[in-house]
Amino acid sequence: MHIYVDETKQRDYLLVASVHVSTDLTALRQTVRGLLLPGQRYLHMKDEKDGRKRTIAQAFVDAGVQATVYRAGSHHRNERQRRSACLEALVQDHAALTEARIILDEDETMVKFDNQKLIEYTRAAGCRDTLRYEHKQSHAEALLAVPDAIAWCWAKGGPWRTLIGPAVTAIRDV
């Protein structure tokens, strides 16, 4: 099981985790590569025009991707607390898997913090040896485009949320 994770801080703090079985990864990577424009290294929704955003979101829905949206409210005092609460819920939700890999979109300012929290949460959940994690940059891992697109659409709301809705299987308020 592979879990790709990205966030958005637009409006609420959202962390989106798209879950994929290993056998689906090649086909999904081909879908992402097929969406790239000539010379484009990776997909990032905030950089795309609306027509492309619709195409990208619809392609992921059509591919059958499934994701959980973790939403941290304002009762958390700051962004780190919100991120921490989302990461803890993410680990709890996947602790029972016999083997899983979490790939987080790399934000250099958060890597050390994430690693400390993930060590703490995987130990507490008893899954330190079965739930692995790493940070990657978007251009190095094409499938980080999936949670990026879902997070962007969900945060925008309205017709964007409706469009991406079939890909969202759960919403967790933390």
Residue positions per predicted region:
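Phosphate-ester processing/binding pockets and catalytic centers
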Residues: 1-174
